[in-house]
Amino acid sequence: MDNAICMFYIVKEAPMISGAAYVVKALQEEQVDILFNYPGAATIDIMDELYKQDKVKVILPRHEQALAHAADGYARSTGKVGVCMVTSGPGATNLVTGIATAYSDSVPLVCITGQVDLGLMGNDAFQEVDTVGIVRNICKYAITVRDRKELGRILKEAFYIARTGRPGPVVVDIPKNIQKAMGSDEYPTEVNIRGYKPNTTVHVGQVKKACSIISKAKRPLFLLGGGVSISGANDLMMKLVEKTGIPVVTTLMGKGAIDSRHPLYLGNIGIHGGYAPNVALTDCDVMISIGTRFNDRITGKLSTFAQNCKIIHIDVDAASISKNIKVDIPIVADAKLAIEKLLEYIEPHDLGEWPAQLQQLKADRPVTQAGEEGLTPQIVIDYINNHYARPIVATDVGQNQLWTTQFLELKGQHQMLTSGGLGTMGYGFPAALGAQIGKPDKRVFAICGDGGVQMNIQEFATAMHYRLPVTLIILNNGFLGNVRQWQQLFYDKRYACTNLLMDESAIVTRDMIDNDKFEYVPDFVKLAEAYGAKAMRITKVEDIEKGFQLADTFKDGPTLLEFIIPTELNVLPMVPAGKSLSDMLLKDKK
């Protein structure tokens, strides 16, 4: 009998780890270095695994909404995906405003929410809400993990979806029993999602058509939105502007698409845009719009917008094209790829007096508060322009946001963080903290109003805890200023529910400021000092430098600089609701 040869094969199985440990491994595989987290029972197993490692630093803000805004600020300032985690129920619902804010402004976030056991879902369990049902319409994608085997695929897809195409937030809801379940530790290396294929090419034929139209234009204009900076196309955009000599206007989110000091840059357009930019938008014969959505803040009355021009619209999101404004040449593409092709095919031509006419108009009708006496937001913001090179500035929402976008000089991407789409009060301060964490060597400012800053003022504790040297600037006029401005101009000064002063019949005047008769709750200086921060109240122009010097020298935490300004100082120009851009108010109604 022949000798039998027996062969044995040893199959090495992948190590088995818990779902909680797998989540941490996924974060590490995706090169996540910062996780913004607020703990709870539904995520305690993941937190325990985070405790055992040192690759992912965990930041503990003091409220889930602020946590989302901090992750948002981190993402906008670094260009990376921001990652946050909260518990189930109220943890998830507190996150909702931050998710919607990021979705409106195309900010890539991965939001992990804890959830009750699968077997308890639908039974009104403690801290149970239908998280996916709540957020489905305010994020790119939301899913509850129902099988431990699917956890890797879902997390891999979450990061891919968040950062590709039009970026945005993705919500992954992980039940507690999935976190405890054992499974393979293998993490996927590829993504293949049926039905989700972001466009990565440019239709050259459409680009050539666009170039043909531009070559015949006598009054062409670039309208740049947030998509230019999101795609990292700022340097290429500058080359395109200089090659063509075409003037540039921007949306609020688009500011920084090119250097705002460039001679061809006219300023912001829209309902609080400058006179020259809005006139240019009305008078141009060809508009090249890149990375914009044409929302109502840009267009004013839709039926009167850009009636006499051809519109070329470039956007990565096909759903944004011809959604509000019918366009002549649609190009669905990433802004950077499209600009590269425009540079390849476009040929400059003589634009006559058009650029010079617009520059003269800008000089004749500047956006300025130069006629105001005493301390103004413009003077404060000009100090930043003149003393800091490429700082990061986060704004809140309201007059503070609009003044900042009017007067702040930007030199490129990742410099100004603001809630442009949703208009979320309480965004500015936590977003600045997230930016400081992401860019520790950068000078970071938050410019807020006295109303919005109180929505997340508790984040002073976070700033002190992590020694974040953010400078919080509060423009304090004693009111919810943006609404009050509308009440002044269109509601006969009936200041209903906007007065934040102790005396509800008072307004802040220059006389009150000069004579120190300003009564306000809280005392922001004492509040900041209670957290261990430095603070100073400033009422005179000559004290501005002293305030910023205080902020520059304190490195162990935040500094609060409170600037007292008159209540009835308004943001102008302004387009009234329902009016066209040509109906701008250039000065206050008497």
What kind of feature is each model-predicted range?
Residues 10-349, 383, 470-472, 490-497, ...:
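N-terminal alpha/beta PP-like core and its mobile active-site loop of ThDP/TPP-dependent enzymes
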Residues 20-23, 28-33, 46-50, 359-436:
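Active-site diphosphate/adenylate-binding microenvironment
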Residues 43, 64-69, 400-402, 540-544:
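Short acidic loop-to-helix transition motifs that present clustered carboxylates
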Residues 112, 121, 126-127, 271, ...:
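Thiamine diphosphate
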Residues 139-141, 192-194, 359-373, 508-510:
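Short glycine/proline- and acidic residue-enriched helix-loop micro-motifs
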Residues 167-170, 348-361, 368:
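Flexible, glycine/charged-enriched surface loops at secondary-structure junctions
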